[in-house]
Amino acid sequence: MASVTNLVDSIVVVECGERWRARAEAAGRLLVLINNHTVELSGEHGSAGEFYSVLTDVGVRVACSSGYAIVLTQISGLLPVEPEPGNFSNVTFPENSAKYYTAYGIVDSGYRGVVKAVQFAPGINTSVPPGQMSLGLVLVKLARKSIHVTSIGSTRDGRTSEANLFYDYFAPKRVEDAGYDISAPEDATIDPDESHFVDLPIVFANSNPAVTPCIFGRSSMNRRGLIVLPTRWVAGRTCCFFILNVNKYPVSITKGQRVAQLLLTEDIDDALIPPTVNYDNPFPTYSPSESTKAPQSPVLWKFTTDFDREAPSSLRADGGFGSTGL
């Protein structure tokens, strides 16, 4: 069986179960998932009114090239069931009546298990009726090279005067991994409903404008109720992001603990990650439209009923939960 690195670029092998329906939209960049069944978002313990994290099986397995990653996101509002539109240009997206929230998740190219979403809902019994949950898988191209990172003040006129400090702050990754791990620079205790600001004293040289660094959370952190606000690393600014504690009790992180991941992207959509620092939105939603940035290469979501045969083998296989794994 072929390696994942041999999968043709811009082709994603997809297996979708009967409990969800799927279709490609937005010039192929987006695979829309709509529930055919009632999704129960129920807390296992606690009291009504608390904000619970629930791991939701979204009914698909996917395999993409190692040069890509897939971002799982909540679509803004609901999609009409009949008739199916050819695009999103004439579709309105009502407010999310179910009051559930979905954390951004990263599906690595090597993951072969069922994709799962980390979702949050208030109260202990929240049900989402059939056709009322709309999620999306967005294909993102990864940059082939890393960026040149220097300490604050060492970049002048676009030129760097120090050695590259990239791997001093970001752990090396495997070929099948989408992101580079970011470790907490210090111990911290985050109070309920409060944010912790992580600010690494480094900047990157914007020598390659095609590369856009973006910071995402980790599934294990999401499940603990610690949400990294997904954001860009803006050129000329330090590498900074917020971690929000949505629990009703303090949660501690320790120095060296993996708390986030850095993705180096080539064609990130502004509708997915806006070109500014995210200060206040832990659960962004993706709003596709005619202005949605088309991928550099046409994307083919290849549906199959024999995923294990058609998807290339991988070292990770179904290890971890996915989106990113726990």
Swiss-Prot record:
The UniProt entry's coiled-coil ranges are: none
For the biological process aspect of GO, one term held by this record is: dUTP metabolic process
**Cofactor(s) of this protein:** Mg(2+)
* Pfam families per record: dUTPase
- Where does the source fall among the domains of life? Viruses
Q: What class of enzyme is it?
A: hydrolase
Q: Which InterPro entries match?
A: dUTPase-like, dUTPase-like_sf, dUTPase_trimeric, HSV_DUT
EC code: 3.6.1.23
Q: Which reaction does it catalyse?
A: dUTP + H2O = dUMP + diphosphate + H(+)
Residues annotated to bind substrate:
R218, S219, S220, F321, G322
For this chain, one GO molecular function annotation is:
dUTP diphosphatase activity
Q: Which UniProt keywords apply?
A: Hydrolase, Magnesium, Metal-binding, Nucleotide metabolism
Q: Quote the function comment for this protein.
A: Involved in nucleotide metabolism: produces dUMP, the immediate precursor of thymidine nucleotides and decreases the intracellular concentration of dUTP to avoid uracil incorporation into viral DNA.
Q: What family is this?
A: Belongs to the dUTPase family.
Q: What is this protein called?
A: Deoxyuridine 5'-triphosphate nucleotidohydrolase
Native organism is Equine herpesvirus 1 (strain Ab4p)
